[in-house]
Amino acid sequence: MHSVLQKNVERKMSSTEKKETNILLALLAYEIFDQAMNIDASTVDWSAVLAEAQCHKVTALMYPAIRSMDGVPEAVFNKVCGTAIAVATASEAMLKEQRRILDLLEAHQIPCAVLKGTSVAYLYPHPELRTIGDIDILVDEENLDEACKALQADGFAPSYTAEKHLCLQKGAVWVEMHRMVSVFPESEKGRFTKQTMADALHHIQTAEIDSVRFPMLSGAYQIIALLAHMEQHLATSGIGLRQVCDWVVTVDALRDCFDGETLALLERCGLLQFAKIMTRLCEKYLGLPPCSWTADASDALVDAMLSDVLEGGNFQAQYAKRPLADVLTDAYDVAGKGKTSLFRNYIRYLKKYLRQNEPWAKSRLWLPVFGVFLPVRWGVRVLLGKRKQINLVHAVGTAREREKLLREMKLYQ
């Protein structure tokens, strides 16, 4: 498989070697690690750099580097500066709203922890420049209903329900109230990770941004939560540079936590290979000081992962590039078959879809019903112009190629 993967890497390397991509990575490394830059601003295709940064939602993180450079076109500086101001303003508002929600939960004596979001943003040199998303809060399963009722009494309305969380909305604020950190596959190591993370709320620390405090997971639990979040998205459409930046600041801040005990735990969870590849990527391309435990990470896999990240972009940009990825890709190979099977992948997707969206349909008899209904509904939406037409041959080829890379991560294996 390594030989096939190497061919894929070689075919994709042009995207990783593009001058504009390397410049974007250098700008991010300057912000995160104050790494020296050697960039002649007059030779840069700034429109390409900005387009790439916007795709990954990291434009605001370019601001400190752009501000320090000579020769950057005024229009480019103004674009980056304007984005930085907008992101910082939104971050401040979200931070205050998050604190207000945490106060509501505290008033109801509901233990909780912030996932992602500010729990990684506070580690950035300039936390306000990290583009915000939803507010993700973890509570125990038995407290989920009460937590959601508290938010509904405050004006939030239920939006949708997923297997791991309930989403509520009030205006422009979206809150994902998690009953679990992530959804784990039904493998031995997947079940072990689920059991381990069920105890996460007993491992809490307090962090702060601009004197605004919030609870978050500590040590190995924060590490596993971030890895699980990344692999969930990687296993379908992919992750972008924003998620890689979150990982690099976390690894650097928790460097001392990656001791023998934590590495052994990651191995038991089936996440050590993934952690090694992502960390080595950060060392190679974002200026992370070397970690001794990544020495045996494959450079071919690291380069392939960067190519995958760059091609994917942030979550909002991925569907057009990787349509039906959730249906066509099986990253875990829980069945241990080794070979990919579109039929098996589709059955796996149907089970997941029914579990998350139609919990009442518990009988296996519903599988063939929805197996026909979902494609028909999708076809009707395409005809009505509500969905873009998809080249299924290309989608299948892309999914199979990515699946080879994902299997090399040995997720939960």
Predicted segments — roles?
Residues H2-G133, V139-Q413:
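Conserved NTP-donor binding/palm subdomain of two-metal-ion nucleotidyltransferases/polymerases, i.e.
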